[in-house]
A protein has these predicted regions:
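Long, charged/polar, surface-exposed segments that mediate recognition or autoinhibition
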Residues: 86-164, 179, 206-242
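Compositionally biased P/S/T/G-rich terminal and signal peptide-adjacent segments
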Residues: 18-104
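C-terminal motif of bacterial Sec signal peptides marking the signal peptidase cleavage site
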Residues: 6-8
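Broad, structure-driven detector of short, well-ordered beta-strand segments within folded domains
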Residues: 76-96, 183-184, 189-204
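Bacterial signal peptide processing site
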Residues: 10-13
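Amphipathic, interaction-prone secondary-structure segments
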Residues: 49-54, 59, 69, 174-200
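A cross-kingdom marker for long, charged
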Residues: 215-280
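Stable alpha-helical elements in mature extracytoplasmic
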Residues: 21, 33, 37, 118-128, ...
């Protein structure tokens, strides 16, 4: 009995050790990314008739996951993850593996936190993305709002457009007292990331903040914006791509004229990244 009891205590201690640090899951894109998802999955792949397959991972509190999005020197870690879903595009001409990764996570480990705790977690998160080389991104058919209008953009459009000029604690608090959500769009070597910070619940003076990450290969993002983008190849694809870029330019000019009328400044120096290398 004493021996069994000791074994039970040791097992309990070992379990506590295991769960004291969240497990790190490494996820990435492409065929390699598909293998990674499958290696962690407890359920089968959800294949949909619309031509997409979904690879689901879920975790429940208190044992949330840490997820490393493995992009070499541009990698970053998402803490306190509740779920991750990889998407494969089955109507591609050949298997290109995971093209979209969606992750839901808590901004903080604790469910409800003070404004100060949330603010420190926001700074740590954005600092990590800055260090990994993620840059501000504008859709090619939208306005290139100048950094000086960051707060105006956050309040009117719900978008951070100067991600690494960190808000002050007062600016953070003032914003979330007025609005429940804000998003940022970033780009890094063929991967597009949109992340939102959502204030979801309150308890006494404390708040809950959720993070939603949507990452797409720029190959998928661009081909999906072109009619029959996944059916075309070679010169046909190049022609369709160029036509799409011309359309985007016209749309951007229209939206930027409107933005100026609304008191926004335009960042003429912003250049769209060269994405053709990933699309062809």
């Amino acid at each position: 009995f004493i021996l069994l009891n000791l074994q039970g205590c040791n097992a309990e201690r070992n379990n506590k050790k295991v769960f004291s640090q969240p497990e790190l899951y490494t996820l990435n894109f492409g065929v390699e990314g598909e293998k990674k998802f499958k290696s962690y999955m407890q359920t089968g792949v959800d294949q949909q008739p619309a031509g997409m397959s979904f690879f689901d991972l879920t975790w429940g509190p208190p044992h949330l996951a840490n997820i490393k999005i493995d992009l070499g020197e541009h990698s970053f870690v998402i803490k306190n993850a509740f779920s991750a879903m990889g998407t494969r595009i089955d109507y591609a001409q050949q298997n290109e593996g995971i093209q979209i990764i969606d992750v839901t996570a808590g901004l903080n480990k604790e469910e409800f936190v003070s404004q100060e705790q949330a603010y420190m977690a926001y700074k740590e998160l954005f600092g990590q993305l800055q260090k990994a080389g993620w840059e501000q991104y504008f859709y090619p058919n939208t306005s290139r709002i100048a950094k000086q209008d960051n707060i105006k953009s956050m309040i009117e459009d719900g978008l951070i457009i100067d991600p690494y000029n960190f808000l002050t604690l007062t600016e953070w608090t003032d914003f979330f007292n007025k609005k429940p959500t804000v998003a940022v769009r970033l780009y890094n070597h063929g991967i597009f990331l949109e992340m939102s910070i959502d204030k979801t619940k309150s308890e006494n003076d404390k708040k809950q903040y959720m993070l939603r990450y949507s990452m797409e290969t720029i190959r998928y993002n661009t081909k999906n914006s072109i009619k029959d983008g996944y059916k075309l190849s070679g010169q046909e694809l190049k022609t369709a791509f160029n036509e799409r870029m011309k359309y985007n330019e016209k749309q951007r000019a229209k939206f930027e004229n409107q933005a100026k009328k609304e008191g926004f400044h335009i960042d003429e120096s912003y250049q769209d990244p060269d994405v053709w290398q990933y699309v062809k």
